[in-house]
Amino acid sequence: MSQARVIYFGAAAIYLVGAVVQFFLAGLGVFGASSYDAHRAFGLILVLVTLVLLVLSIVGRMPRTTIILTVVLLGLNVLQMVLANTDVGEIAALHPVNGVVIVFLAYELTQRSRRYVASKMAA
């Protein structure tokens, strides 16, 4: 079994935790801290983790659906930055909705990679 697959699973789990942390940081921006600087900076880190996930999914020869969903996750991350930087309120309001979709997709990718790694280890 490819090490990239195991690393993908670990990185996906880290990404999932990071996506949840993003909600906390956004909450701090609303209810505590005076700015969203930590939320913005951490969001950029998550984009980089998504790029790493994409490379690992390809190098590790993950199932095609996992690779495609990883590309979708990257696209949602880019969309997240666009939504956060628009001046149209109705469009910007989709930013937290997209964040929820990102968390669910990150969970799905973590579960898929866990099952895939477990099945390859058992074989």
Features from the language model and the residues they span:
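Polytopic transmembrane helical bundles with strong interfacial aromatic enrichment
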Residues: 1-123
